[in-house]
Structure formats: structure tokens, C-alpha cells
Amino acid sequence: HKPNLAHEQAKWIKAQNTDELKRIAQRATFLQLENLLKSAVKNNNVSDNAELYLNLIESLKDYPLQMDATTTYIDARIKSVSKNTPSEEVKALKHEIEQVIAQNPTHFLRNRWEQGIFTLLINADDTEGLVHYAQRVKPSSLEMQIAVLNAELQLERTKNETNKKQNSNSDSNIISRYEQLWLANSKLPNDAQLWAKWYSDGKRTQDKIYQKAEELFAQNDANGMALLSSELNKIDSAKEDEMVLANLKRFESLLKNPATLPELADRLPLIEENNKIVTKFAVVQTFPRYLRTLSETMKEPNFAPYQQWAKNWQLTDAQIREWEIAFLGRFFDNENPNFQQWRDAEILKLKADNLTERRLRMAIWQKTDLTPWLNALSIEGQQKQEWRYWQAKTIAKRDSKKTKEILTALSNERGFYPMLAATKLHPKTRGNGYDFGQPELLIAPSISDPYWADEFKKVNPALEEIAELRQLERFGPAKQRWRFLLENLSGDAKKEKQMALSQYANQQNWFDLGVDGSIIAKAFDYIQLRLPIAYSHYYDIALKSRPALSKSKPQAALNTNVSKSFAMAISRQESAWNPQAQSSANARGLMQLLPSTAKATADNAKLPYAGEADLFKPLNNILLGTAHLAELNAKYPNNRILIASAYNAGAHRVEKWLARANGKLEMDEFVASIPFYETRGYVQNVLTYDFYYQILQEKEDPQTFSNEEYDRLY
């Protein structure tokens, strides 16, 4: 009997459709259940419809987020508990949560369940239960930690009253633990009883006040300092020591306005009997902030007055060194010849790599000898790819053999400078043979390999949860579970498992999670894993399209000269393939466009743009991002170094850097002397990623650098 293949295929398709329809229905139920429970909590009637909620949860059998639904119901019931709730109900709910934990001991939600029991016991005002529970589970939030300490103090007081004791060792231990929280936090919730007990026990000493002030100062917490200085206002008869209060006010003032430092530092400090200067930390820590209030172009920067401060305030040699490094960093580019001479002498003396590297970059764009600065680097600094490259270039004329040796070794590594080394070794072909030390691409193990079958079975429920959360566009929670999954894999070959799962993520088009997984696995040599071919068809469409051209900028919207590998390299560097990425400057989406840039580009290229939300949509973002790259390509034809610099830092800054270079710098010199650390690294990464993407896209004769990049003077 031969199987009817068409019949079997039809059955399979029908089953798939049935499963998909069931999933859609369950998804709708899940979302409606969440809304019902939200309303029930608001109306304080969760318990009135328990059967309804349980039936809805039961209907979610085999739905990946059924456990989330159960958790939402548990949370709603916890919120409904008060001190008037019968203790039997509280115990029953606690037991129910503990059963869920026992049945799912390794689930991502375990911590939420465990912490939920704290909230349950706090809401129920179950002092004894709270203390006992805290002995085996650690409370995570400050609010819960304080609640536990309050409960312990209450039990201890009851016990002492029964035994007619004044204090006990347990009492002292509670207050000691409270003190650690007080020292580490500017404000604590619901700590009135603990604070009063701690204060009445004489624990709020001047040493403790200054210890906390120093911590607040390090955190730049002016509000916390204000709270500390007014802390005794809560006690009618108490008054802060005048000197302490004056110092706390001074610390607050310094945090708000570092320019006032001389008012404190110019005075001779008060040295206490133990030879301690209690306000010293404020002077030490404010100095770098104070320097930022001074003009970098002041007539003649002079460190001598600050050396006098350092002497008066008894700074250690290490602290003076940090001050001098900060001073040099602030005025580094000052044009005063006396300062420059002193700066160079001090850099050679201090041997601080951050200053030495900055001086090296200055020497590169000024085209002066690098040797003294290369020699001043630490051993670690000299081993960086960048400085090995410049060492080779510096000695090229006098020792070609050594130069070739350095460049050859460098060309067997990954990165921008290895790629540059390969180009130097083979200038005619632009280093076309560069293979970053990997003649063959390292392929990550696949989770679908039979070898991983048991592991896949174990993690599949978590992967299904992640898939469903992403379907619901809950990308943040999905990423949290992804990281939890990868970081908590058990057994041997953890890195291989992490890589296999990252490969799986890329296969599911979870490109941001695939990249994230490759970082967690430290799979730096696995280029295919680190640089997935993401949203490939969108880039094809965007780069083939020719939007209407602006009359004022006839070339502005032409995408034809922007390569797919370059556009993808920019995206990978900008967002690590996270469509929801948002920077502190409000750049958004895959290609991290500012709304203002997006609007201007859309107007110029005649592209649709409805507002900021569009930038979180991959296709919209790619259309606008590639159009903006095309605008920059029109300005800097086929020069990815200038395009990438402008994309990151703005074209106005690129023009400024080109004006400084004045047509005298070679490509490597221009890149090394880009003043912004972020932009310098950005350009190097983008060009390297572009080369890798050309290989991954199987481009014939992948190009390291174009003629426009390599042959011109900048």
C-alpha cells in the first residue's frame, strides 16, 4: 500500500492551521485575562471571580505564556491581601505559590514568585511569618529589606518586654544591618522606627555622617546630601552639630556648583586629633569637576596653585597623580607654548596610557616623530593592535624586515588594524587576501543537530515563551528571559550550547538576541554568528529604490552607490540589530536615526514618515537610514570613512577635522587622529564589519578600502 503524499500533506497543513488558529485564540484570551485582572485589582474584587480566572487559565493549556497568566493571577491575589485577610487564606496562597516554585524550580519567574511571598506577608502584616521566610529567602528590594528589619525589631521588642530585658544581641544585629543600608542609600522607605532606634542607640556619629556624605558625594547625589543635612529635623529636640551642618551644606553646594571649589580649597583645612581631614574627600573628588568649569583655551594653564592645594590638604602621591592627569586632560590642546612644553615633559614622566595615546594622535596629525610616545606606552599599551601598526610604520624606513614581521603577525588577527596591515603588505591588491586568521569561517553548532536533541528538548519551553513574548511585541521581557536562559545553562559545553542557541535565534529572525547570545558566549571568532544577515530583503529593496530627488540636492536621495554590506555594517554597529534600540540622545531603531534627521531625510527623499514611532519599524528605519547614507555619499562619494564619521558625529564635525588635516594626512593618519573616541572606534568597526559582510554575502573580491578612501590625502 503506497501512501498518498498529497493526502498526507493536506492533513499536515490542516493540523498546522488548526494549531495556529488555537494559538491566536489563546493569545487573545491571555491578553483579555490580563485586562480583567487589572480591573479586578483596581475594583478590589479579585476573589469574587476566582472560578472565572481559573477557567481562563485552564483554557491556556499548551500556550507558552500560561505560567505568566498564572503569575498575573497570583500577583492580583497578593495585591488583594490586607491585614484583615484571614490567616488561613494567606497561608493557603503562600502554600500555592511555594507549590508553583517547587514544580518549576528553574523557571525565569522563580524570583518573582519568591519575592511575591514577601509582598504577601507584608500586606497581611504577618510579622512572624515574614521573619521566618526571610531566613531562607533573601529580600531583593530596599522596601522589602526594611520591612523584614522592621518585623525583626518588632518581634525582638515583644520578646524583650516579655523577658523584661532592655536590649539584646539580636537587637544590636538588626540595627547594625540597618546601618549598612543607611550608609549605602540616600533615602530609605518606611524606616522611621529603625532610624529612631539606631539614633537613640547613639549610632549616628560624626564619623558615620561623613562616611555617608563621602558615598553620596561619589554618586554626585546633591538631593541625598540635602536629606542628610536635614535628617535631624524629624526630632524636635535634636540639633545637628554646627560644624557638621556647615560641612554638609558645603558638600551640597559643591555638588551643585563645582566652580566654588576654591572657596574651600584655598583655606587651610581643619586637621583633627587623629590627623584626619574630614572634608578632604570633597576637595579630592570635586577637582576634576572643577576643571570642567574652566576654559580649555585659558591664557596660561598652570598646575602650581593646585600643587599647593594638594600639599595643604595632604593628598597622597597617587591622588596628586590623578589630579595632574585630569589637569593635563582638560587643557591638552591649549596652544600656550610654555604649557605645551610642560605637558610633553609631564606625559613622559607620568606614563599614563590615556595621555600618551592622546599625544600619539597629536603627533600623527602633526606628522612628527612617534618614537618617544610609543616608547612611553606601558607594555599592555604597546601590545594594542593600533600601536603595533604604528610601531611598524614608524620603523619602516630603518628596519623593513621588522616592519614586515610586525605587519604579518598583525594581519593574522581580526580587526581594522589587521586589515590595514594586510593592505600595507599587499598595496596593489588592497590586502584582498586578508582572511583575519580564519581561512574558513567558523560555523556555530546548530541546535537542530541530533547531538543537541536532549538539550533542545530541555530549553524548548523557554524558547517558546520568548517567541510568544516577541509576537506580543514585549521585546524587553523576551530579552530578559533570553539572557536568563543562556546564563543558566547547566552541564558541560556551556559555550557551545550558548552558540547553538544564538544560531537558533538568528534562524528565527531574532537577530538582536543572536548578537546578544554571541556576546554572552564570547564567540568573537564566529563572524557569522556575530554578524547575521538581518533584514536582507529590506536592504535589497531600499538600495534598489530611487526615491524622488530634491531639486536643491539632486544627488541627495540616490542610493545606488551605498553597498548593502556597508548599510548593514552601519546598522550592526548602531543597534546590534535591535529594532527597539533607543539612545540617550533619542536616536531610534536599527540605524539609530534622530527624529529630526529622519524628518529632514524623508522630506528630501520624498519618503513616507509619520513620526517617531516609525523609526522602530525595521523597513521604515532602513528606508530612511539608507537614504541618509546616500545623502552623505553624495557629499563624500564612495568614502566610507567620511560617511561613517558624519553619520556618527555629524558632517559639520567632519568638515572641521578635514580643515585641521588640511590635505596632508594619509587615510590611516586621518582615522587615528579623529578626536572623538567613540567616532574613531565607530569608523574602524564599520569598515571591518563591511569587509566581513562582503565575505558573508559571498561577494567576489571583497574590498578592504576603496581608491577614494585609500589614495586620497585628507
Please identify what each model-predicted range represents.
Residues H1-T72, K79-S82, E88-K91, Y434-A462, ...:
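N-terminal leader/linker segments that initiate helical-solenoid repeat arrays
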Residues A25, L37-N45, K61, I78, ...:
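Hydrophobic/aromatic side-chain positions at a characteristic register within alpha-helices
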Residues V46-I57, N84-Q103, T127-V137, K159-L183, ...:
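Alpha-helical repeat scaffolds
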Residues L33, I74, F118, L149-L153, ...:
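Conserved small-residue packing positions in alpha-helical repeats and bundles
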Residues I74-D75, E114-T119, E324-D333, W342-I379:
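Alpha-helical adaptor scaffolds
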Residues L21-L31, N49, D62-T70, A92-L93, ...:
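Generic helix N-cap/helix-start motif at coil->alpha-helix transitions
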Residues A304, Q308, N312, L348, ...:
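Catalytic glycan-binding domains that act on GlcNAc-containing polysaccharides
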